[in-house]
C-alpha cells in the first residue's frame, strides 16, 4: 500500500503554512511584494499565465513543489511520456501525447512504433477529408456533401463539438458540422431538422461500435437517410463512415471498412479529440489547420515535459488547484472564457477533470485520504457576470476562477457610439473582474463615496477571491490545442499527488448495466416484478402508467 500523502512531512508543512496565510488578504500580499504581478507569471507556447492573484506567496509555491517532488512527479511524468502502463487498473499505457508527436519522432511501446501508426491514420483522415471538402466524395445520388453529422457521446462528442465551435472561423469549405450525442430522440430530431439526406455525411464514433446511445442514434439516422433517399442499404456506404476499431460491426452496419478510422486502447475518450475522433473537425477546417491544432498540443506537451517545475505552467496550476481543494476546502473551479467561441470549453473540461480525478480509491485500491476531483463549471463572459458572478464576489463559498482571454478577436464590431471596439469593451470587463475579485472594495471606501450607512454592508466587496488569468494572442487552431493540453496536464499533476489512476472510469459502468436491465421492465406488456428498492419500484410504475403500460 502506498503511503498516506496527508501524513507526509511535505503535506504537514503545507497545513502549517495554510494556517498562517489563510487570513492574509491579496491586498496585503501585493503590498508586501509589489513585483508579484510581473514575477508570478509563466508562459507555455503562446499562453501567458498570471497566477499572482492567488492566495499564495513564494513560500507557498516552494512548499507545493516540495510536495510534488515528494511523490516523484517528474518520474511519473516521464513514465507517461515513455509509454509505461501508468493506467494500472486497466494495465494500459497513457499516450494521448503521442497523438501529436511530429511524423519524424519515434516512440516504440510494447514493440510497436506508435508514431508511425498515428500518422498512418492522420494521412488517411487527410485524404478522406480532402475528398469531402473538394466535392470529390459524392453521396448516393451524386451530390456533394454539405453537412457532416458526428454521432458519438462523451469524449466522442464533447471534444469535437467544443473544438468545432471554437474554430468556426476556420471552417472554409462550405461544410457545416452538427453533433448528435444524447439518446433522447429530441437531440437527433432537432439536429437533422432541415438537412437534405442527399448532402449529409454521418461519422459514427464508437471505439467498439457497440455504445448503446451512439448505435441507437446511428440506426435512427440510417433509417432517416434511407427513407429520405428512397434507396436501399447500398446507399449507407456513401453517407456513413466510422471511427472505430471493430471492423466486423462496422461492416455489418453497412459502412465500408475502407472508411473506418481507428484509434488505440492507450487513448482515453476524454483525451481523444486529437485522434480520429476529431475527423469532423478536420472535415470542417482541413488537414493543414488540424496539423496546427496538433502542433499546439505538442508545444505544451514539450513545455510540460522539459520545463523546470518552478516554471512549468501545468505543474504550477495543478498544484494551486490542489492547494484550494485540500487546504482551503474549495469544491469547484469556475472556467470563464471571454470568448463566445469557447462556449463549450467548460463542459469539455468537466469531463476531463471529473471523469479523470473523481476517484475515492488510490491506484493500489486503498481509500484516498484527501478530497479529490475539482468540479469545473462556467460560462463565457460577459454572460456569467449577469448570472452567477454575484456568488463569486459576495458569496460564502470560495470558488477559484480561470479567466481566459485573447488579444485579438475572431469578430469585432464598433461599440454603441460607432467608434470603439466591442472586443475592447469585452476585455475591459475581463480585466475589471479579475481586479475586483482580488482586491474588492472596503466598507471605508464605500462610505467615503457618500453611500448611506445602511447600504454599506450590502455593497462591500470582500475581495481575496483567487483567479488565474490566461491570455493568448488569438483563438487559433494551435492555441485551442495549447489550452486543452494545459488542462490535461494539470489533471495529471493532481492525480499523481493524490495517488489515483486518472485514466480509468469505472464509475460510469454500473449505471450502463442497470439501464440495460431496467429497459425491459419499462416496456414489458406484463406487470413487472417488484424492484429491489421501493423508490425505483414506485418510479418505474409511475413511468409505465404515463406510457399506458400499467
UniProtKB/Swiss-Prot annotation:
InterPro entries: G6P_Isomerase (IPR001672), G6P_Isomerase_C (IPR023096), Phosphoglucose_isomerase_CS (IPR018189), SIS_dom_sf (IPR046348), SIS_PGI_1 (IPR035476), SIS_PGI_2 (IPR035482)
Active site residues according to the UniProt entry: 355 (proton donor), 386, 512
Subcellular localization: Cytoplasm
EC numbers for this chain: 5.3.1.9
One Gene Ontology cellular component annotation held by this UniProt entry: cytosol
Source superkingdom: Bacteria
EC main group: isomerase
Gene Ontology BP terms: gluconeogenesis; glucose 6-phosphate metabolic process; glycolytic process
UniProt entry keywords in alphabetical sequence: Cytoplasm, Gluconeogenesis, Glycolysis, Isomerase
Catalysed reaction, written as an equation: alpha-D-glucose 6-phosphate = beta-D-fructose 6-phosphate
Transmembrane segments: none
Signal sequence segment: none
An example molecular function term from Gene Ontology annotations: monosaccharide binding
UniProt pathway annotation: Carbohydrate biosynthesis; gluconeogenesis; Carbohydrate degradation; glycolysis; D-glyceraldehyde 3-phosphate and glycerone phosphate from D-glucose: step 2/4
SUPFAM superfamilies xrefs: SIS domain
PANTHER family listed in its UniProt record: GLUCOSE-6-PHOSPHATE ISOMERASE
Family: Belongs to the GPI family.
Role according to the record: Catalyzes the reversible isomerization of glucose-6-phosphate to fructose-6-phosphate.
Name the record gives this protein: Glucose-6-phosphate isomerase
